[in-house]
Amino acid sequence: MGSWIPKLLLLQLVLLLTKHADSSSIIKYLPGFEGPLPFELETGYIGVGDEDEDQMFYYFIKSESNPEEDPLLVWLSGGPGCSSFTGLVYENGPLGFKVEAYNGSIPTLVSTTYSWTKVANIIYLDQPVGAGFSYSRNPFADRPSDTGSAKLVNEFVRKWLAKHPDYFSNPFYVTGNSYSGKVIPAIVQEISNGNYICCKPQINLQGYVIGNPVAYYDHDKDSRIPFAHGVALISDELFESLKRSCGGSYSIVDPLNTECLKLIKDYHKCVSGIYQELILKPKCETTSPDCYTYRYLLSIYWANNEIVRRALKVVEGSKGKWERCDLSVRSNQDIKSSIPYHMNNSIKGYRSLVISGDHDMTIPFLGTQAWIRSLNYSITEKWRPWMILDQVAGYTKTYANKMTLATVKGGGHTLEYKPEENSILFKRWISGQPL
């Protein structure tokens, strides 16, 4: 008799989650922000997958300009396992945290000046399932995968548009950075195929934006050593020895190549004190308010507050501790390389913008340039600086496949390190202006 109790409790939990699933709410006030929100925010869930068992949580912010005609973006953070909330409050959204020592109260939110929502509608989507506030109603759900995520995001977007038919005709873009930059080209292909083969509503797909994206991770990592040499983190002698002994491959090394392995250890000793996401920032303890990464703790304090969860309409019991980047979301990384997807999307004529912070050592610009070259498209606009107020903000190059590469001078692994410059860059590109 007693063995039925856990099953009964599990059934009750599933019924509770089912009852509240696939819903949305307009949010006018957020804990930590003074007064009503100066923009339109909706949060909610869309069920995807078998019997809608995967409940994907999103934050939708209407364009503050002309929402009826402005582009519609879905924004995906990296990881895999990072909540899209990290994009909303740290990178390109209309809210950010006031950075101050945590005193036990709800962290303070303030308005930003650089939000992409000035010119675009944005759906910040927690994916894959398990990231952010997304959850599965199936306690035995399969491990998420890159290709599976592409299919589920396609399903999410179609279902979201069915519930928001006013946005059918808006130009649609898939956007994000870091690890999501590997999956985004597959999502674009999935949406494109759906438009051609089977599915309604038709999505007005125009292209994609990716920042410091993973493309072929081993090759991306290989570019760290020449990058480190180029910015004077390792010596000429060590670099030349590494090239000679390792043959340019530093991620996958023959275990019998002891000389290469020893030199790679020497390399790691040289860069162990470097903050790889932006080499100009100090590497320090996140618990110190003086450290840049302390701001990440504020989102954890905020999102784990019960008052905040009620305000966001998070389904009770659906999520334990919220993590900005939940490394326990172990994804099956079955897309080895995104390059074939870029090729297919180019053939179909979709625009793309590749942003690269030039001081990121996680996914260095050298690796990004290398995979773009491998596409073998002719150059339609040669390498040149792009400017803000007569100052060089970065460099750009455009290719015949409608792909634009733009570096951001002094930028890091994500948009947050140069938000104003990234905002100007995006606004010019999305409107079709020259950078």
Swiss-Prot record:
Keywords: Carboxypeptidase, Disulfide bond, Glycoprotein, Hydrolase, Protease, Secreted, Signal. InterPro entries: AB_hydrolase_fold, Peptidase_S10. GO terms for biological process: proteolysis. It comes from the Eukaryota. Glycans are attached at residues 103, 344, 376. The active site is at residues 178, 360, 413. GO terms for cellular component: extracellular region. Residues 1-23 form the signal peptide. Its EC number is 3.4.16.-. It is an enzyme of class 3 (hydrolase). GO terms for molecular function: serine-type carboxypeptidase activity. Expressed in senescent leaves. It is found in: Secreted. Disulfide bonds join 82-325, 246-260, 284-291. Probable carboxypeptidase. PANTHER family: SERINE CARBOXYPEPTIDASE-LIKE 14-RELATED, SERINE PROTEASE FAMILY S10 SERINE CARBOXYPEPTIDASE. Belongs to the peptidase S10 family. This is Serine carboxypeptidase-like 14. The gene is SCPL14.
